[in-house]
């Protein structure tokens, strides 16, 4: 699982869900990628689940790049607890993803297999995504 090694503060403010991605909107390493269409938080478990979906479908011969990292703690209060008495304890780590962000990249010689692998990974993510390629743009 992806988690930060060290953080300056145990809890943080909730990230804003507005605006568009400033960087990371183009494919840098691979030939194909998954691009976010809407805002959302992606947890470390969802990132790992999408990575496994890609690697199991392409088996060998492909390379996967993960361009997002869960650097924000998500806090939650215990069940059946009254409101008040401070913020809840950190439960998981999330990456704040804005529209236009390329989250995963894949380099694989067969286009049909690469698109199918990325489609399977996109189903694991909590927001609407589209598959993009380096030359053609989106599919």
Curated annotation (Swiss-Prot):
Which Gene Ontology molecular function entries are recorded, alphabetically? rRNA binding; structural constituent of ribosome; tRNA binding
Q: Could you tell me which cysteines form disulfide bridges? A: none
GO annotation, cellular component aspect: cytosolic large ribosomal subunit
Q: Does the keyword RNA-binding apply?
A: yes
Q: Tell me the protein's name.
A: Large ribosomal subunit protein uL16
What this chain does, per the entry, is described as: Binds 23S rRNA and is also seen to make contacts with the A and possibly P site tRNAs.
Write out the similarity annotation.
Belongs to the universal ribosomal protein uL16 family.
- The answer to whether keyword Transmembrane helix applies is no
Q: How does it assemble?
A: Part of the 50S ribosomal subunit.
Regions crossing the membrane: none
Q: Which UniProt keywords apply?
A: Ribonucleoprotein, Ribosomal protein, RNA-binding, rRNA-binding, tRNA-binding
Annotated PROSITE patterns: RIBOSOMAL_L16_1
Pfam families recorded: Ribosomal_L16
**NCBIfam families, per the entry:** rplP_bact
């Amino acid at each position: 699982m992806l988690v930060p090694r060290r953080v300056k503060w145990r809890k943080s403010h909730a990230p804003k869900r507005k605006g568009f991605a400033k960087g990371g909107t183009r494919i840098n390493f691979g030939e194909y990628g998954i691009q976010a269409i809407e805002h959302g938080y992606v947890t470390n478990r969802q990132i790992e689940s999408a990575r496994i979906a890609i690697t199991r479908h392409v088996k060998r011969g492909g390379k996967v790049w993960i361009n997002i990292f869960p650097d924000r703690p998500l806090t939650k209060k215990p069940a059946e607890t009254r409101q008040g008495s401070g913020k809840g304890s950190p439960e998981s780590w999330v990456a704040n993803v804005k529209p236009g962000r390329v989250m995963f990249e894949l380099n694989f010689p067969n286009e049909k297999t690469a698109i199918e692998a990325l489609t399977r990974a996109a189903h694991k993510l909590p927001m609407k995504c589209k598959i993009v390629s380096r030359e053609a743009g989106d599919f």
